[in-house]
């Protein structure tokens, strides 16, 4: 069936079995960052609207409801190598090659993060399928990753550039990210679309249960941080603010997945200096994390680089006020003076001032928490994100 559109006849995709192959490093149960959370919820929401296949890193896993998932492990390229410095980029590259060995019959390939961009590039060349990439962060703007990847950082930058510049469409998770993409890469501005991250409003909401706090030995009054042990996440700036915070308020760092052993050792050492710092060196399960969001006095996101910052949505959905850095996509999520406070990144003194204001004025904190929940309900549902993404796929297929 077709639909007339001016002088051009285009497929009526309402009646076509539109399908997408999503390529990702992270997929449940192996999710440790915002990009993985995004893929998890987006794929589930899209599966209500269309056919979804997910190709991901890792061992074979149980099939998710409503879609198909295929897992791919890296080739052991480095077992006999003389120089293992490049393994952190070469091993993902081997997974990218494995991902395209199985024929792709979907209408669109959608890749997330540089870890899979070469798979998308190869899929476009081999199978002629349109390619869309979602940019969750930009390698050129994360120079500290050279500490994590070593010399392979140059290869990760090349993989990202190659995938992005070959894309038929590029999704930016914030307006700020779109500006950064256009600065870093040779991409037609018309191809770059902004689709924000979302959140499951039924799942992320305030919980009255306080069992998790007791389980982890957390004080009644606490400031919550959630994120990887990474310089990007600003964890050292929050630790730098501790001397200016009340001694009876605990700073709780839910910080797993260290970038490097050196960064982990540094975080552990700094945290140990303060009796009111509680370091939880693991990725706290979602159900327990929602409880911790719900009962925190304040949520703190001190990132120095954050294209979106889905953790702020999670805290706001649980009616907790947010103090965050005025960077990237955070400024499109947290409304300064309404749902929390924004401070300049890398300034522990400013961070402490904002945190103390909310710790002292609990009525202000309550109002900001309520306003945060309302904002999330109005603008950041996954169903909305999925429909916008589905519509972009349709556009790509029509103009192919």
Question: Where are these predicted regions, by residue range?
Answer:
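Short, structured helix-loop element that forms part of the nucleotide-activated donor/catalytic region
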Residues: 247-276, 287-288, 364
């Amino acid at each position: 069936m077709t639909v007339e559109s001016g002088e051009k006849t285009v497929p009526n995709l309402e009646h076509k079995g539109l399908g997408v192959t999503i390529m990702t490093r992270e997929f449940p149960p192996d999710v440790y960052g915002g990009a993985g959370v995004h893929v998890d919820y987006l794929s589930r929401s899209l599966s209500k609207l269309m056919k979804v296949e997910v190709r991901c890193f890792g061992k074979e896993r149980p099939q998710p409801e409503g879609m198909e998932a295929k897992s791919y492990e890296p080739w052991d390229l480095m077992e006999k190598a003389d120089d293992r410095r490049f393994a952190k980029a070469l091993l993902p590259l081997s997974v990218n090659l494995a991902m395209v060995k199985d024929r792709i019959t979907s209408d669109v390939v959608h890749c997330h993060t540089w870890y899979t961009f070469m798979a998308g590039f190869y899929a476009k060349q081999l199978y002629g399928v349109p390619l869309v990439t979602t940019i969750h962060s930009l390698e050129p703007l994360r120079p500290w990753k050279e500490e994590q990847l070593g010399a392979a950082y140059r290869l990760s930058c090349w993989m990202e550039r190659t995938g992005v510049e070959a894309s038929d469409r590029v999704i930016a998770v914030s307006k700020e990210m779109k500006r950064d993409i256009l600065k870093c890469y040779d991409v037609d501005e018309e191809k770059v679309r902004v689709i924000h991250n979302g959140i499951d409003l039924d799942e992320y909401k305030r919980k009255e249960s306080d069992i998790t706090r007791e389980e982890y030995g957390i004080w009644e009054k606490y400031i919550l941080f959630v994120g990887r042990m990474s310089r990007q996440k600003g964890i050292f700036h929050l630790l730098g603010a501790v001397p200016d915070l009340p001694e009876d308020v605990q700073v709780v760092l839910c910080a797993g997945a260290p970038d490097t052993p050196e960064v982990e050792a540094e975080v552990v050492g700094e945290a140990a200096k303060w009796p009111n710092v509680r370091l939880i060196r693991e990725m706290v399960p979602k159900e327990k994390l929602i409880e911790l969001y719900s009962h925190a006095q304040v949520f703190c996101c001190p990132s120095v680089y954050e294209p979106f910052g889905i953790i702020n949505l999670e805290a706001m959905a649980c009616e907790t006020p947010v103090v965050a850095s005025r960077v990237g996509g955070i400024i499109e999520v947290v409304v300064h003076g309404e749902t929390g406070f924004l401070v300049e990144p890398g300034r522990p003194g400013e961070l402490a001032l904002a945190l103390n204001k909310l710790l002292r004025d609990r009525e202000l904190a309550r109002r900001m928490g309520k306003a945060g929940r309302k904002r999330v309900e109005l603008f950041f549902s996954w169903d909305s994100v999925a429909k916008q993404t589905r519509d972009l796929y349709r556009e790509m297929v029509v103009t192919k």
